[in-house]
């Protein structure tokens, strides 16, 4: 490097990160004694200001949580990731970057019907979240953004319909006609 003043300034940050606005100034001099000049630039640590989305899954109209529901997150770059609810009916998508996001339920345990609602929201560069759309019916997907910026999604599923057939049989396992239940 030539003798003089060197300025270092970040001009573009990776997607999902903030630009470090500090300007670093380094003066390069020579003592003319022939020795090498070494300067180490230590990259400053800029904490990522990421957001998380907490999801809680329950049976419609009850406080019964549902384990094993799978949710899909489509990121702003079009890639997808999935998470599965735990024994508390909870799961989390971490590190939501800037741009538009889509959340949908992709599978549930056999005794439930998949909620076909889709929630779309946008994370701005100042980490504010705006809900773009929610196609769920009957408030079955409730998206909330708290004052501290925390995002949560509460999702309800209904039980799948089923038919119960009861047969009365004798001791030889032969069906008996005319029994009423």
List the predicted regions and their residue ranges.
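Solvent-exposed loop/turn and edge beta-strand elements of beta-rich ligand-binding domains
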Residues: 1-181
């Amino acid at each position: 490097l030539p003798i003089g003043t060197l300025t270092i300034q970040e001009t573009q940050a990776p997607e999902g990160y903030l630009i470090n606005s500090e300007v670093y100034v380094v003066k390069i001099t020579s003592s003319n004694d022939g020795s090498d000049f070494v300067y180490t630039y230590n990259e400053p640590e800029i904490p990522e200001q990421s957001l998380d989305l907490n999801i809680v899954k329950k049976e419609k109209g009850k406080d019964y949580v549902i384990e094993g529901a799978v949710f899909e997150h489509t990121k702003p770059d079009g890639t997808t990731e999935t998470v599965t609810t735990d024994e508390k009916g909870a799961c989390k998508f971490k590190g939501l970057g800037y741009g538009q996001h889509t959340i949908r339920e992709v599978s549930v345990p056999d005794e439930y019907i998949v909620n076909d609602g889709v929630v779309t929201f946008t994370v701005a560069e100042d980490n504010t979240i705006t809900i773009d759309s929610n196609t769920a019916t009957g408030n079955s997907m409730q998206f909330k953004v708290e004052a501290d910026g925390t995002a949560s999604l509460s999702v309800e599923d209904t039980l799948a319909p089923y038919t119960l057939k009861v047969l009365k049989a004798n001791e030889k396992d032969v069906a008996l006609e005319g029994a009423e239940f």
